[in-house]
């Protein structure tokens, strides 16, 4: 599973995006922060949505996952202890990309583009026509329908 955040600054929102490696099935959850507690909750919701825990999860260098690269030698990173304990508890391996190599997570990066331009921008326009703004509640309700019927 490849995991990333995508930011929507005009709406003061971020979206947690998880894309499975082989099927490319994706899960999206809109949030108002990218704190460790939010990241853990989003993972649990993604695992529930997919019906199980992925064997490996791939991340970029987000501070909620990795504190310092190569802290204990090449390829031996200092991980956020809360996140490391969470991964052990759930039973998945943590993999991290090399810095500035977002293409390593190409599946989730491609889906982020699709989410932004096929879903989020369309939702903003649809809601603006009714004098509404995108918020966590309406974005999460609509994105689940979109994931199940379109994406």
Task: Enumerate the language-model features and the residues they cover.
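Mobile-element integrase/transposase regions
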Residues: 1-26, 35-41, 88
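Short small-residue beta-strand/loop micro-motif enriched in glycine and branched aliphatics
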Residues: 24-29, 67
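Short secondary-structure boundary/capping segments
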Residues: 71-76, 111-115
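Two-metal-ion acidic nuclease core segments, chiefly of the RNase H-like superfamily
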Residues: 75-94
């Amino acid at each position: 599973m490849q995991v990333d955040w995508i930011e929507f600054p005009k709406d003061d929102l971020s979206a947690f995006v998880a894309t499975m490696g082989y099927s490319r099935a994706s899960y999206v959850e809109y949030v108002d922060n990218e704190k460790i507690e939010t990241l853990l909750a989003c993972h649990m919701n993604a695992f529930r949505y997919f019906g199980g825990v992925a064997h490996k999860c791939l991340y970029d260098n987000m501070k909620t996952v990795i504190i310092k690269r190569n802290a204990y030698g090449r390829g031996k990173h200092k991980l956020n202890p809360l996140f490391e304990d969470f991964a052990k508890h759930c039973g998945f391996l943590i993999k991290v990309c090399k810095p500035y190599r977002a293409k390593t997570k190409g599946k989730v990066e491609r889906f982020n583009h699709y989410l932004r331009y096929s879903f989020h921008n369309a939702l903003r326009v649809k809601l603006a026509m009714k004098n509404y703004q995108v918020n966590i509640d309406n974005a999460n309700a609509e994105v689940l329908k979109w994931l199940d019927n379109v994406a």
